[in-house]
Amino acid sequence: MSDMTTIARPYAKAAFDFAVDKDQLDQWGQMLSFATEVTKNEQMNELLKGSVSADKLAEIFVAVCGEQVDAHGQNLIKVMAENGRLTALPDVCEQFFLLKKEHEKEIDVEVISASELSDEQLANIGSKLEVRLERKVKLNCSVDETLLGGVIIRAGDLVIDNSARGRLNRLSDALQS
């Protein structure tokens, strides 16, 4: 785990808890995403790494964000600037969205197949995974022809390797032991 993740987590948790309390998860997600884009601006990045005072930096940052960030979001920016943590804003945004997905019981699932899957196959995989994982599933599909056949499914810590290549590897391991 990176240092920035450790630094970002309390800010993300505070923003998340506030957003849940005020029923503003989507708005906070948009604000944090916008503020993250501002940090990626070359000139802003120079200011963040420079020797500008915290008050001045917060003032400039809030001015650049304009109406895209409400008073509560501006307060978060000011607190982060006072603590010299504005460079962690992209990580705060990332942590916020992880908390949001967990709250909404949603999970990203990577589906790698040997060939393009039909809509029916994807719907079938999605519905079975939703039952097994007890979450809303968002499928991210890709094709890897080296699998020979079948699919590999990755959802968090869960990996289901039902590819021909995976089966051959397991058979080879079993024969060698």
From Swiss-Prot:
GO terms for cellular component: plasma membrane; proton-transporting ATP synthase complex. GO terms for molecular function: proton-transporting ATP synthase activity, rotational mechanism. Keywords: ATP synthesis, Cell inner membrane, Cell membrane, CF(1), Hydrogen ion transport, Ion transport, Membrane, Transport. F-type ATPases have 2 components, F(1) - the catalytic core - and F(0) - the membrane proton channel. F(1) has five subunits: alpha(3), beta(3), gamma(1), delta(1), epsilon(1). F(0) has three main subunits: a(1), b(2) and c(10-14). The alpha and beta chains form an alternating ring which encloses part of the gamma chain. F(1) is attached to F(0) by a central stalk formed by the gamma and epsilon chains, while a peripheral stalk is formed by the delta and b chains. F(1)F(0) ATP synthase produces ATP from ADP in the presence of a proton or sodium gradient. F-type ATPases consist of two structural domains, F(1) containing the extramembraneous catalytic core and F(0) containing the membrane proton channel, linked together by a central stalk and a peripheral stalk. During catalysis, ATP synthesis in the catalytic domain of F(1) is coupled via a rotary mechanism of the central stalk subunits to proton translocation. Belongs to the ATPase delta chain family. This is ATP synthase subunit delta 1. It comes from Vibrio campbellii (strain ATCC BAA-1116).
